[in-house]
């Protein structure tokens, strides 16, 4: 299948306010001669109270989720519903913080014949599974140097192929948003017959842009990790773990800093560590001031 014939299958999720991201990803896709459709992402703060009552559960609204997370989940679910009602058999869905390389669509085009093969029964194929649980249990098929199989604990919805059958399964299981959509997909993978695949090598790259799910935060830690190009570690530290009343976010970095502060007060008694933690916590929370 040529890239021109894939245009109706390729969707990029992008918030209207994130014009810089759209410009960057448009340039990247044009460089690789890939046509796509833009999906105007659902902005969580704009969803109605009626939508929240019908589609977001109590724990999510009060303890686990923020508006960005709810909007992200709503955007993906809307595209899954659109796929089911379309004539297409699969969608290739990208969030706007990814980057293609010269081999991305060469490999994607070679994946497509496997989507209709009952031997593999693919529901969902993650194109950028980079978290620490993404190792595949065993190789089921190979394309060039890329080995494909079912991962142990995959996360991320930054880029993936989903079949119509897979979209039906996800929507049957995810009636209400309860947490990050990639965690919900992970639970479905564990407790159902949902066939989730990924590869041993990322097919697209995650950029080091600020997350649009959590609130933007400039800290010494984030500046240092950006300088080192530790993109996934930075994303992991800044992703919100839980949120109080959709606003006050607690992420991994905050928890680690609080633990460091406790350890320092009990054992190390180091003034530099103390003031470093205080400064980082201030930078993390100045958005609320």
Predicted regions, residues:
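An acidic/histidine-cluster motif and surrounding catalytic segment
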Residues: 2-94, 98-289
